[in-house]
């Protein structure tokens, strides 16, 4: 199999991995509920934590991050030394993220992408991911509002990508696209923040 064909296969596999709705699966298997019908209706870690406690939320966060981390690491291993290996690995990362936002298994109605995005940055730009985690912790600690922490961390991850790679590498631009999609997914949260109606967690 040619490197480009293998890269395309890995991109498709990345999308399918990203589409796995761990929040929904664990909600049904462990909690006996469909998390899409409780709280905010989101399938991500924050809403799972509302439905089943912090431990369940952390588990979903880790799994949602892992479904991006594993495909990226696999792509890097299988494409090591091949032409455009870094570009293909970045494409796999984006595909996993798109899978989380638009999962084929849920009629293309997915989550907001924060944990999956964090997993991507953890592999492609670890220092940016660390900056994002610190930013999340500080912003959430000050406000007790999850969306404020998530958006702060996302912005720092995107900035950290450019600080790590500059502007001539595909990773920071992919990171910027991911950050913009996360902000777009949080548009209702942003509106509530502006109105002072966003709930604390």
Swiss-Prot record:
Pathway stated in the Swiss-Prot or TrEMBL entry: Lipid metabolism; phospholipid metabolism
Q: Which reaction does it catalyse?
A: an acyl phosphate + sn-glycerol 3-phosphate = a 1-acyl-sn-glycero-3-phosphate + phosphate
Record keyword Signal present: no
What family name appears in the similarity comment? Belongs to the PlsY family.
Q: What is this protein called?
A: Glycerol-3-phosphate acyltransferase
Give the organism's phylogenetic lineage. Answer: Bacteria, Pseudomonadati, Myxococcota, Myxococcia, Myxococcales
Q: Which SMART domains match?
A: G3P_acyltransf
Query: Where are the membrane-spanning stretches?
Result: 5-25, 55-75, 88-108, 118-138, 164-184
Which keywords fit this entry according to its UniProt record? Cell inner membrane, Cell membrane, Lipid biosynthesis, Lipid metabolism, Membrane, Phospholipid biosynthesis, Phospholipid metabolism, Transferase, Transmembrane, Transmembrane helix
- One GO MF term attached to the UniProt entry: acyl-phosphate glycerol-3-phosphate acyltransferase activity
**What EC designation does it have?**
2.3.1.275
Sorted alphabetically, the Gene Ontology BP terms of this entry are: phospholipid biosynthetic process
How this chain sits in the membrane, per its record, is: Multi-pass membrane protein
Offer a single GO CC term for the protein.
Answer: plasma membrane
């Amino acid at each position: 199999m040619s490197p480009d064909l293998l890269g395309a296969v890995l991109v498709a596999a990345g999308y399918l991995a990203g589409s796995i709705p761990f929040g929904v699966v664990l909600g049904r298997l462990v909690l006996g509920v469909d998390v899409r019908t409780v709280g905010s209706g989101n399938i991500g870690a924050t809403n799972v934590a509302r439905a089943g406690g912090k431990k369940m939320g952390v588990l979903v966060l880790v799994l949602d991050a892992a479904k991006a981390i594993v495909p990226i690491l696999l792509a890097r291993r299988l494409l090591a030394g091949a032409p455009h290996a870094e570009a293909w690995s970045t494409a796999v990362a984006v595909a996993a993220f798109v899978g989380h936002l638009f999962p084929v298994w849920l009629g293309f109605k997915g989550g907001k992408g924060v944990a999956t995005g964090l997993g991507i940055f953890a592999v492609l730009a670890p220092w940016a991911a660390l900056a994002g985690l610190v930013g999340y912790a500080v912003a959430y600690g000050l406000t007790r509002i999850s969306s404020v922490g998530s958006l702060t961390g996302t912005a720092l991850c995107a900035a950290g990508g450019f600080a790590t790679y500059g502007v001539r590498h595909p990773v920071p631009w992919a990171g910027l696209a991911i950050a913009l999609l996360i902000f777009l997914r949080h548009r209702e949260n942003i509106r509530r923040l502006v109105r002072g109606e966003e709930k604390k967690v």
